[in-house]
Amino acid sequence: MHSSTHDDLVILGGTFDPIHYGHLRAVEEVRQALAIAQAMLIPAGHPPHRKSPWADARHRLAMTRIAVAHHPQFTVSSWEVEREGPSYTVDTLTALRQQRPDAVLAMVIGMDAFLRFDTWHHWQHILDLTHLVVTGRPGWPAAELPEALRQALYQRRCEDVDALRQTPAGCILFHTVTALEISASNIRSLLAGHQSPRFLLPDEVLDYIDAEGLYQSP
């Protein structure tokens, strides 16, 4: 079994527009299941796979930091926010792997994102840099997956956490987390309609949103 190190890391990237309890609970449950001490949240600066975020990168980074300020097991990276150009996951993971050559890296990804994973920039190389922890059980016929992704799943799927921890990277693990039906788009809609999204995200984040006047209807 791969020996555990203090550099082992669970990773969650996203626009976090805004960050909410769905993000935080998923990464915390994966962190505990993998018995990894640290998790890193990485707000995207210029996400290449979706339209521009509603809040600018400075605000999204600030909200992410506020959300985990009192939780020392979480760190927040500003790499993608500070970097010029598109926020390609493979570039961020390459930098992380250079810093932590022997560590177990486990990137959390939702089922919807996994079904489009073969469209990501250099997606196959990503699997050489990190494990993928897909937060959901596969509920589709494998034949419906794109051929390249189906082959990757066949070659790299891990059945359990112990199998994943044998190596620093390269496994795809499906892991069920608490299903919190929270979406950033719904939170934005509530705010634009002058309704409160309290209890969907940390109070401190909501206070920041109110103070900065974010997500208000035009």
Swiss-Prot record:
Record has Methyltransferase as a keyword: no
Top class in the EC scheme: transferase
InterPro entries xrefs: Cyt_trans-like (IPR004821), NadD/NMNAT (IPR005248), Rossmann-like_a/b/a_fold (IPR014729)
Known catalytic reactions: nicotinate beta-D-ribonucleotide + ATP + H(+) = deamido-NAD(+) + diphosphate
Biological processes per GO annotation: NAD biosynthetic process
Pfam family, one: CTP_transf_like
EC number from the UniProt entry: 2.7.7.18
Metabolic or biological pathway: Cofactor biosynthesis; NAD(+) biosynthesis; deamido-NAD(+) from nicotinate D-ribonucleotide: step 1/1
Keywords per UniProt: ATP-binding, NAD, Nucleotide-binding, Nucleotidyltransferase, Pyridine nucleotide biosynthesis, Transferase
CDD domains: NMNAT
GO molecular function: ATP binding; nicotinate-nucleotide adenylyltransferase activity
Role: Catalyzes the reversible adenylation of nicotinate mononucleotide (NaMN) to nicotinic acid adenine dinucleotide (NaAD).
The protein's name in its UniProt record: Probable nicotinate-nucleotide adenylyltransferase
Gene field: nadD
Family: Belongs to the NadD family.
Native organism taxonomy: Bacteria, Pseudomonadati, Pseudomonadota, Acidithiobacillia, Acidithiobacillales
